[in-house]
Amino acid sequence: MIVKFIVIIFCTHKYNQLYIKKMKEQITYDIFNKVDIRLGTVISVKKNEKARKPSLVVEVDFGKEIGIKQSSAQITHYYNEENLKGKQVIAVCNFAEKNIAGVISQVLILGSVDSEGKVTLVHPSQKADNGLPIA
């Protein structure tokens, strides 16, 4: 089952409003199968001081096969170092790296974005092994 309203946490409030109003164009299963979505555990969190909008630099352990990857994420409304460290998250692991405010973002952590631009991260309902693929 594909959830229709999961969006990448780097979207803006304006983009979010447009996204909720209209579903994106359909894709084939072949295209979806190219997206490598994995489960990982947050091992470190710090503020991204260079970012224009409040952001966190999050390091996630995706297990032996993928290793530790980092992401710059605009998730500061609900999350901080204390409540995010140790939490399991779901991320797209095979996007090209992107420099975001001086941080090389290697993965895109997934979350839902409400009408005010506040992000709630997607996470498993129970603890699972790092690196497991999401199908």
Give residue spans per PLM region:
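Phosphate-backbone binding interfaces of nucleic-acid-interacting proteins
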Residues: K22-A135
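Intrinsically disordered, low-complexity polyampholyte segments enriched for Lys and acidic residues
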Residues: K4, K14-N16, K21-K22
